C-alpha cells in the first residue's frame, strides 16, 4: 500500500508559515481597498502637474559645456603651420539634464512600487489556489486568468526599468561623442533629442502606471469572489 505523500513541518515552522499567510492576506486587503484607489488618484493628480505638461520640449534642453573648435585652416596655409599641433580643449564636468533627472527621481520609485505590488498580488492569488482535484474548476480558471494578466503588467513594468537604464547609456554615449567629435553639431543635437524623447517616455510611463493600477483594481474587484473562493465554499473576508 502506498504511503501518503506530503510535506511535514514542525509545529513551529507551521506557525511561521501561517503567520506569513495571514500577513500576506492582510497586505492584499490593504492593497485592494486602500492603496489602489489612493494611488490612482495620486497618479491622476501627478499628470496634471506642470512638470508633466511641458508643451515646448526645447525648454527641456540642458546646456552642453563642450567647446566648439575653431574652423579648419585655409588650404594656402604654410605646411609647417598645418603640422603644428594645436592644443585640444578638454571638457570638464558634464552634468546630466536636471529637469529629466528630477522626473526620473519621481517616476522611478513608482515603477518599483508597482512591480512589488504585482508580486504581492501574484503571491496572494497563488496561496488561494485550492488543491487540484475533480470538480468545478471555473473559479480556478478565473484565478489563472487574473494571474496571467498581473504577470503581463509586471513584465511591462520591468520593461520600464530597462528603458530608464537605456536613457543613461544612450545619453552618455551621445555626450561622449559630442565631447570627442566637437566639430560635429549633430552629436550635440542628439543629446538634446535624447532628453526630449526621455521626457515623452516618462510621461507615457506615468500614464501607463495609472492605467495598470486601474486595470488591477477592476480585474481583482470584479472577480474577487472567485479569486478568494474558487470552489464556492464558505470562507470569511478575503481569505
UniProtKB/Swiss-Prot annotation:
GO biological process terms, semicolon-separated: regulation of G1/S transition of mitotic cell cycle; regulation of proteasomal protein catabolic process
Induction of synthesis: By IFNG/IFN-gamma.
GO-annotated cellular components: cytoplasm; cytosol; extracellular exosome; membrane; nucleoplasm; proteasome activator complex; proteasome complex
InterPro entries in alphabetical order: PA28_C (IPR003186), PA28_C_sf (IPR036997), PA28_N_sf (IPR036996), Proteasome_activ_PA28 (IPR009077), Proteasome_activ_PA28_N (IPR003185), Proteasome_activ_sf (IPR036252)
Residues modified to N-acetylalanine: 2
GO-annotated molecular function: endopeptidase activator activity; identical protein binding
Pfam families, sorted: PA28_C (PF02252), PA28_N (PF02251)
Cysteine pairs bridged by disulfides in the record: none
Keyword terms: Acetylation, Phosphoprotein, Proteasome
Phosphoserine: modified positions: 10
PANTHER family in alphabetical order: PROTEASOME ACTIVATOR COMPLEX SUBUNIT 2 (PTHR10660:SF6), PROTEASOME REGULATOR PA28 (PTHR10660)
Role description: Implicated in immunoproteasome assembly and required for efficient antigen processing. The PA28 activator complex enhances the generation of class I binding peptides by altering the cleavage pattern of the proteasome.
Oligomer and partners: Heterodimer of PSME1 and PSME2, which forms a hexameric ring.
Membership in a protein family: Belongs to the PA28 family.
Protein name: Proteasome activator complex subunit 2
Organism whose genome encodes this protein: Homo sapiens
Source taxonomy: Eukaryota, Metazoa, Chordata, Craniata, Vertebrata
Amino acid at each position: 500500500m502506498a504511503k501518503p505523500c506530503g510535506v511535514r513541518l514542525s509545529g513551529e515552522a507551521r506557525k511561521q508559515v501561517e503567520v506569513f499567510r495571514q500577513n500576506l492576506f492582510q497586505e492584499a486587503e490593504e492593497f485592494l481597498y486602500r492603496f489602489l484607489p489612493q494611488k490612482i488618484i495620486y497618479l491622476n493628480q501627478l499628470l496634471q502637474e506642470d512638470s508633466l505638461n511641458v508643451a515646448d520640449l526645447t525648454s527641456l534642453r540642458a546646456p552642453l559645456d563642450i567647446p566648439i573648435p575653431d574652423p579648419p585652416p585655409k588650404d594656402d596655409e604654410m605646411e609647417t603651420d598645418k603640422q603644428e599641433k594645436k592644443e585640444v580643449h578638454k571638457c570638464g564636468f558634464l552634468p546630466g539634464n536636471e529637469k529629466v533627472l528630477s522626473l526620473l527621481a519621481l517616476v522611478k520609485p513608482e515603477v518599483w512600487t508597482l512591480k512589488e505590488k504585482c508580486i504581492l498580488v501574484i503571491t496572494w492569488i497563488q496561496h488561494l489556489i485550492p488543491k487540484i482535484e475533480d470538480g468545478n474548476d471555473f473559479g480556478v480558471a478565473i484565478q489563472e486568468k487574473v494571474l496571467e494578466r498581473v504577470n503581463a503588467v509586471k513584465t511591462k513594468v520591468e520593461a520600464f526599468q530597462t528603458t530608464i537604464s537605456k536613457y543613461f547609456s544612450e545619453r552618455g554615449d551621445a555626450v561622449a561623442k559630442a565631447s570627442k567629435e566637437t566639430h560635429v553639431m549633430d552629436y550635440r543635437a542628439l543629446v538634446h533629442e535624447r532628453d526630449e524623447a526621455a521626457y515623452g517616455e516618462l510621461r507615457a510611463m506615468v500614464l501607463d502606471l495609472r492605467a495598470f493600477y486601474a486595470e488591477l483594481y477592476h480585474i481583482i474587484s470584479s472577480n474577487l469572489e472567485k479569486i478568494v473562493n474558487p470552489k464556492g465554499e464558505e470562507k470569511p473576508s478575503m481569505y
